[in-house]
Amino acid sequence: MDVVLTLAGNLVPLYALIVLGYIAGKFFNVDRQTLGALGIYIIMPIVTFGYVAQMEFRPSYIALPVVFYAMITCVCFIWLAAGKKVYGDSRANLMAISSASGNTGYFGLPLALMLLPEEWVGVYIFANLGALLFEATILYYLAARGRFSVRESLIKLARFPTIYAVAAGVAYNLSGTGMADVVVTYWEYFKGSYVVIGMMIIGAALAKVKRMVWAPRFISLTFAGKFFMLPLISVGLIMLDQSALHLFDAQVHKIMFILTIVPIGANIAAFAVEMDLKPEKAASTILYSTVFALISIPFSLYLYENFIAITP
């Protein structure tokens, strides 16, 4: 229990930044879209490039985004089928995308910075490409109930600058050219600012929730997919690799686990508003999942480190 409390204590500063973002959005009218644009189009690509350019790249890492994409797609369609039986309306779509979509960027990257050696954060970012691809394809399609074609979804994906930052980082990495000290110094500034801006964006987004909705059955089913089934699939694949495949080492296993234990993605609220997909229920569920993660993440990591992880 002491270990769980210690891990929870380490998360408190991140949640303090969320609270600051909430205050800024609620009382000072800070625009989350402006913060989001700053994070997505300027800070995140620079941070991403730096990490990927400096990581020790291995060909086997190419499989990571594919594996993660397959995992979350599997959960999404299982929960979509279950949602159609329970609800039979658009709530099934919302439950499916909420169960599969995690806040792997704004929340997950600061968490990775806290839990991983710095040289492995680039691998986390590379693996997270699977989440970006899922968002631009399956998530868009289900959120819009078929409104976007595959071509339109891919065009939306092509507009996401992090894709190009990863590609540029891989190319620079393979060139064997090291980053100059002065570049690394300023890149460190961007890395710190991303943690602050990213967590505050979550708070600013939650500040715009006009009415909280408490739907116990919907929340329970969504949480079962997000906080139980998805990590369970991850653990199954990790144990398969540990016992038979031996493709990845312990840090990669931990990265795949971290990707599955973060709260529901904040972008779900934006999709719900745009598509008229019960936006208040979506925003409320995101808030509940973010609060719940303060307990679930330390507990999940404790179980992982003590019963699943193999010390290298």
Please identify what each model-predicted range represents:
Residues 1-312:
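Alpha-helical transmembrane segments of multi-pass small-molecule/ion transporters
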